[in-house]
Design a protein with these regions (language model features):
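Hydrophobic alpha-helical transmembrane segments of multi-pass integral membrane proteins
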Residues: 1-143
């Protein structure tokens, strides 16, 4: 989880730098909307922050004891990576003044579906961990 959070931090910061330099290099008007400008925030929020929160939950509730946690990790991260990649590609096309295709939107939609499925798996694992944790606390107070 730490490596995933650190990787998202590095790629999030790099994507912000890429956005600034790529738009400047190509004479793209400042303040004009492009998806390229949002990749930075998506990677930092959906990547770094979520992984840090999950890391804290893992430490306190042992989420990885549930087999769905592994499914969450890989599904969610595949979704974030796919979404960020499609946003980057779409943003590059916008800056270069080239049209985007429906395929890019479709693949980005698939990325969003994977993120959603990942969140569902996380909440299923979290619910199981909360019940396990609650049962242990109840057993401790009755003993």
């Amino acid at each position: 989880l730490f490596i995933a959070a650190a990787t998202y931090l590095a790629t999030g910061l790099a994507s912000g730098l890429f956005y600034r330099e790529f738009t400047k290099l190509n004479g793209f008007p400042e303040g004009t909307a492009t998806q390229l400008g949002f990749v930075h925030t998506h990677l930092l929020a959906l990547g770094t922050l979520v992984m840090l929160i999950v890391m804290a939950l893992e430490k306190t509730m042992a989420l990885s004891a549930d087999r769905r946690f592994t499914w969450f990790f890989w599904t969610y991260n595949a979704g974030v990576a796919l979404t960020a990649a499609m946003m980057t590609w779409h943003g590059i096309l916008t800056v270069l003044g080239r049209p985007s295709s429906a395929a890019i939107a479709g693949v980005a939609g698939l990325g969003h579906m994977l993120v959603t499925a990942g969140f569902v798996l996380l909440f299923l694992a979290l619910g199981s961990a909360v019940r396990r944790h609650s049962a242990v606390e109840t057993a401790d107070t009755t003993a």
